[in-house]
């Protein structure tokens, strides 16, 4: 879902 995408981006930082 949308939160999964947010988590993926957060791991990039």
From Swiss-Prot:
It is found in: Secreted. This is Aurein-1.2. The modification Phenylalanine amide is found at residue 13. InterPro entries: Aurein_antimicrobial_peptide. Antimicrobial activity against B.cereus, L.lactis, L.innocua, M.luteus, P.multocida, S.aureus, S.epidermidis and S.uberis. Probably acts by disturbing membrane functions with its amphipathic structure. Shows anticancer activity. GO terms for biological process: defense response to bacterium. Keywords: Amidation, Amphibian defense peptide, Antibiotic, Antimicrobial, Secreted.
